[in-house]
Regions:
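Alpha-helical membrane-targeting segments
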Residues: 1-22
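Electropositive phosphate-/nucleotide-binding environments in soluble metabolic enzymes
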Residues: 9, 13, 25, 111-115
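C-terminal cap/substrate-recognition subdomain and adjoining C-terminal extension
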Residues: 28-29, 33-36, 40-179
């Protein structure tokens, strides 16, 4: 699936479904433990120090930090132990009777799904966002709908398609972070 996606022989949606199919038949507790270990051992060490500093800065300024991502949420919860992230909104996996089916529950949280999921989350909490004072960060064209909502739109090590799509938008900037 990875090679097929890299060669553009399949869609991002299908590649994601294939990459997550290994979860089928695994218990919820097992998957969540594997996810936390993956996050701690693989993901957190790879975070850009500038990104971590930026999140901490925004939090210190009083911002409520939300992670809105196409990634599956089962392995991201451990980020809350390291970063000032209040909530994670991402791709949900289908669980039936405590067992992962390997299927995505609903839609992949990318593109227009990001602002839709945020709106659902806010409505469920009776909460609001001041988009005129908000910051959003992204790296791909799938982040453009979320970036477009916020006054401060930051493309981090962006793919060219995102820069083309957002070029000229008020509040749009590009940054390059490294390890």
């Amino acid at each position: 699936w990875a090679a097929a996606y890299g060669l553009r022989l399949t869609t991002a949606e299908r590649a994601k479904r294939e990459s997550l199919s290994f979860l089928a038949g695994r218990g919820q507790a097992e998957v969540e433990a594997l996810g936390r270990a993956f996050c701690r051992e693989e993901l957190i060490p790879r975070l850009y120090p500038q990104g971590v500093e930026e999140l901490r800065k925004r939090h210190a300024e009083g911002a409520e930090v939300l992670l809105i991502t196409a990634s599956p949420t089962f392995y991201l919860e451990a980020l809350k132990d390291e970063l000032p992230i209040r909530r994670i909104i991402g791709t949900r996996m289908h669980v039936e009777n405590g067992v992962y089916t390997g299927l995505i529950a609903g839609e992949n949280c990318r593109g227009v799904q990001k602002p839709l999921r945020l709106a659902e989350d806010l409505a469920a909490r009776g909460d609001m966002v001041d988009y005129a004072a908000s910051w959003a960060y992204g790296d791909s064209a799938g982040d453009a709908p979320m970036l477009a909502l916020c006054a401060h739109k930051v493309a981090v090590n962006p793919k060219k398609k995102l820069v083309r799509r957002m070029k000229g938008a008020d509040g749009f900037s590009v940054v390059y972070w490294s390890k």
